[in-house]
């Protein structure tokens, strides 16, 4: 069978020689047969063992290599095939391989298999008898140099790169100066302003052209046109290129001189020959103003002091009318009923506008901030009073204006304040007293309605609408609660104590317990010394127990059961020791509960029994050197840190809350114990002080849990609630002999933190922990008495807590003392610019002190105080919070203001009244405290005088000549008069009086003064000398 062979596209009939199989291959490679045979040595030889080991290692490496290659092929065979049969793609100037898909991979594998099959057949000689005949096309001559393309079956056309056509950018070619010149030419013809915007917002230059008479002059918009007065208004580098361009289109057609430059010329660019007084180096002058008669250029940097002296030539009238037009057009009425015609001139309109402004906002300068801001601080009543007063003072001028502008009559009548419609002010004030201080929503709404009713006709329509809405809400509330009067009562309140004890993981951890099961403090015990060192007292066993049995507080006392540590073996006495001393048992009341959003917070309430009665505390027996924690179930007794084995400690009065932080220390990690104790000692204790409120203590506990989160689950010691004295007692290991207190349910630090919430409603968060300090009233009076002799403290009270000065109304002597030392006048001046109502109160006290100085009887002075207290109390109702004691002062004023009326009612009904005797005793007490303060003040003054005289005399005798002694004596006499407020005569000095005869260096001083017998010495007054000698002892002789 004849076959034809094709060379590319050209067939050929040339017979091919039969293929022969090559049986012998000549190669230069070394085959396995040509290699020397390996002889395996005997295992017993010295060479065998290394060979065996190396062979095994080589086989292991080859095996691992084959396994790796097999794993690699299995894992990456798909990616390799995709890359192998992928296409070369050129895109964006890059050439990369585009991976083939599954169909392309299958097609490629099939093609490879066909090629491999052909090559195998060809190498095996299976195609020896195959003859391919080809055809040669006539006319083709290879000799001509023509190329022959042999295209195989696997040929494919290559991708052609498509050229992208680039669109050339059209760039306009123009000269910038020419463009800007044309813009400025247009601006000069129509007086159009031009803005040149820089790279930043504050780099904008505003310029343009202005008509001055018949001339066209360029100008710059300067910063002082916007009331921004700076040293240099235009930098020369910024406008150096712009000034010549602006000057090109300047046309001066008038004769100008330097004297003609006045207001309105600010910013104009004038030639140097016109602004002849400008002594600057510029050819063109940018007018800013005049300084010392010379025209100043805006590019010149002036000193800071000369900026205010410069008379700037900006046109204020233009800015005024620009603002007037803008504001007038914004407030034009929405409805237009007619077509407006201009009938009057601008002068008429200006007078009308000025009249309306002065009636509504009387002032001296509209540009003055003080004149404008005083209306912001005024109340509506004060504003109405000011308008009435101003209209009365300027009634003649206003009547003349009304004749010219009849419409002003309606304006004046509307601005006139109207009389208060409510004539029953007494009832309104009584409502204000009843609603004062209540936080209930309904009471606050009633107070708001009452304040609107007091205003009467002066109330605005919005206030009347608010009052109607509040009245509707109160009516709905009363309608909803009329049938459920008992809702919210404590009849159904139950807060039983949990029967299960709280689990504290820190006390149950085996790693923190010794072989006896006791808690191991570790490093916590070492760092707890910071508590015991400064805020705990050491208890002496035995007779020392009696000293700590009574735990005193200013408002009450409690007995500890520390005496029961001495146990008697008499059964009867022991049974007697188990009886406590019971206080008055108070029933369940609103003081026992705390609420949030109208719901009970049970952990912040007192514990009750099943029937709703409160759980009263029984006797708490003492233990020795223990910390007792746990409020539910049986208490947990933890040994105190073993700092000293035989010592017992008790917290100082006012610091019993430290037992809470000591209990929290149990849950602190040992590595954080140092930080915990230092934070309590350095931050918490100084912040809380003695006898803090429960809210402050809970806030401090929250701070500690924020830094040490594990303390939130710490168990607390038992806390007893004394509602009579408003106190909470933290029970320590010495227990409590006093019984009958309520028990607080909070058992962990997290539960105690609820008292820190401002949303918590209840009285217990204001209770003192550990007792109550001095009453707030007594603290304020004590601070007031001590401030009379301490000017810095007095100034601090006036600035920070001015209500303390109102407490002077408890005694006529205090009011007169504050008036004499100028405290009341200083307070009135200080507060007149901050709160006029506070200043008015001090003015009332000044008038009261003047009236009381004329009264001879104490009862008459107290009557004046009672009458003044009513006025002060009424004024205080409209004050804002300006101090921490406003509520305390308000209660005090309400008490003394109602005292006089209550005494009258008692006298009418025939009851005896001891208020006069009470006032007499109180006045003696206050006068005594004031006299003691004055005595201390005089004592210090005399001591300082003695010290001054001794030092002055010693320095004078050593340094100055004898002839100047007379002048020195006069100076000492004047100093004594100024300091002691009386003439002591000519002072003399006697060494034998001022020095002790028995002093060791007395003879030395005698010899010294004998040598200086010509000198005159100062004799100290007898009282101060003896007092100083007693205070300083032997140092006085030195």
Swiss-Prot record:
Looking at the UniProt record, the site noted as Cleavage sits at 313-314, 770-771
**MF annotations from Gene Ontology:** cysteine-type endopeptidase activity; serine-type peptidase activity
Q: Biological process GO annotation list? A: proteolysis; symbiont-mediated suppression of host innate immune response; transport of virus in host, cell to cell; viral translational frameshifting
Query: In the UniProt entry, which residues are flagged as the active site?
Result: 224, 233, 266, 656, 729
Motif span (Involved in virions binding and aphid transmission)? 622-624
GO cellular component, as recorded: host cell plasmodesma
Q: Which residues form the Peptidase C6 domain?
A: 648-770
In short, the EC number is 3.4.21.-, 3.4.22.45
Where the record places motif Involved in interaction with stylet and aphid transmission is 365-368
Matches recorded under InterPro entries: HC-pro, HC_PRO_CPD_dom, HC_PRO_CPD_sf, Pept_S30_P1_potyvir, Potyvirid-P3
Q: Do you know which Pfam families this protein is assigned to? A: Peptidase_C6, Peptidase_S30, Potyvirid-P3
Posttranslational mods: Potyviral RNA is expressed as two polyproteins which undergo post-translational proteolytic processing. Genome polyprotein is processed by NIa-pro, P1 and HC-pro proteinases resulting in the production of at least ten individual proteins. P3N-PIPO is cleaved by P1 and HC-pro proteinases resulting in the production of three individual proteins. The P1 proteinase and the HC-pro cleave only their respective C-termini autocatalytically.
Q: Does the keyword Cell membrane apply?
A: no
Signal peptide interval: none
Q: Which keywords annotate this record?
A: Host cell junction, Host-virus interaction, Hydrolase, Inhibition of host innate immune response by virus, Protease, Serine protease, Suppressor of RNA silencing, Transport, Viral immunoevasion, Viral movement protein
Locate the Peptidase S30 domain: which residues? 170-313
Q: Does the keyword Hydrolase apply?
A: yes
Question: What family, per the record?
Answer: Belongs to the potyviridae P3N-PIPO polyprotein family.
Q: What is known of its domains?
A: The N-terminus of helper component proteinase is involved in interaction with stylets. The central part is involved in interaction with virions and the C-terminus is involved in cell-to cell movement of the virus.
Name of this chain's protein:
P3N-PIPO polyprotein
Q: Which organism is it from?
A: Beet mosaic virus (BtMV)
